[in-house]
Amino acid sequence: MKATQAVLNKILDNCRHIEAGLVKRVLILYEEAEFFIGDNCLRFDQLKSCKPFFNGAMLDINFNNKHFAERYQALVKNNPNIDHATYLAWKEIDFEAYDVIICITYEEEALIKYLEAEYSAAILNGKWNVAIFSATLHYMKPLANCDIIFPSYDDLMDYAVSTAGMEPVELYLTAAEREWGNQWLRDRGLKDDEQLFIMLDSTSRKKKLLRTSVYFNILSYLLEQDKVKVLIFDEKNIGKEAFYRHWLGDEKAERLIFSKSLKLREDFCLLGSAYTKMIFGPCTGLMHCASSIYNNFIRNGMPRSDAPLMITYTGKYWRLDQIWDACITAYYWWGNSPLVNCLIIRKEADQPEMVELCNLNEEERNATDNLLFCDAYSDTMLINYLSSKLNRAPVVLMNAVA
């Protein structure tokens, strides 16, 4: 224990004397027990503050949990703010190559013990003057049995906060990937004169979803539009096609396209397809990814009018799911998403009321006591909204369930 404390004391001293402008290489150690697409889409974009803070230093990130490797790779591929993404065990990492290590992991205590066992001489004699900081509690939920060993790098965190929201979140899809999505859709019957609407139907919490009857009434309305086909993601190939046919009947179901068992990055290619003209869904990971893809397209010259209509519906958030109180508002999740039309369902005069986030003042954006869960949305209010945005006349729903 004394040896470990001596190593830690030397690292802490290095932290106190760090000069960010002299740092050449930075390593982020990232490990989480659960994976949420939307959380990580936003989180990895925040890494764009690291390079300018460290004056252009090389930035590598190592994902310790290999179980999520394919999904991590989908989110960081082509990201210009990250030089290398690896999936190595600690014994495979050349730690001495780095001047700064940033921990976003619950394993900080295990890390200091590992470094003491493998690098104590280099650390104590000053051969390796590494500074190690913790960002764990900035990005992850605190756990009762989680010991934070390393200090927060407050200057870096302050810089990240000061630059947050200056630019929208981005994902980086290449022209070749976009064309892959176009061809995949053509191979499944989408014609050049047809539009693709994408309906997102899954999320981490059931309360974030519409009632099933409301969802299918909306989908039925969309399928009645001319020259439109609708894409449904069936990531785990759980048999969604049969379920949709049961609800819609064979005739309307023929206008559906199901993507089954595709990789996450391939899903991105479909979201970014040139055929995609509308994306509708709950506050969920793929909606954040869609927003991020088109933010990047527009920054690189796409006319804003060429981006699809994107609509997310939100309501009351589960407090226990969130790291900070601010996370229980739609504004936290969508306030920096200029392309997304964010809807909120709330109670007004004891009746459900649907409002747009962009029309709320600061007090209304931060209010949570009047929010309702998403099962309070009606098909009528959503279809009327969709028809106004799509410039199509709403249909009369003979069997709609309000």
Regions found by a protein language model. Name each.
Residues 1-11, 133-196, 398-401:
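A nucleotide-sugar donor-handling region in carbohydrate enzymes
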Residues 102-103, 199, 281:
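Redox-cofactor binding/interface segments in oxidoreductases and associated redox assembly factors
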Residues 88-95, 210-320:
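Donor-binding and catalytic core of enzymes assembling or modifying cell-surface/extracellular glycoconjugates
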Residues 65-74, 109-112, 206-208, 236-246, ...:
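Short, charged/polar "capping" segments at the starts of alpha-helices
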Residues 72-89, 248-259, 334-342:
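Structural recognition of alpha->loop->beta junctions
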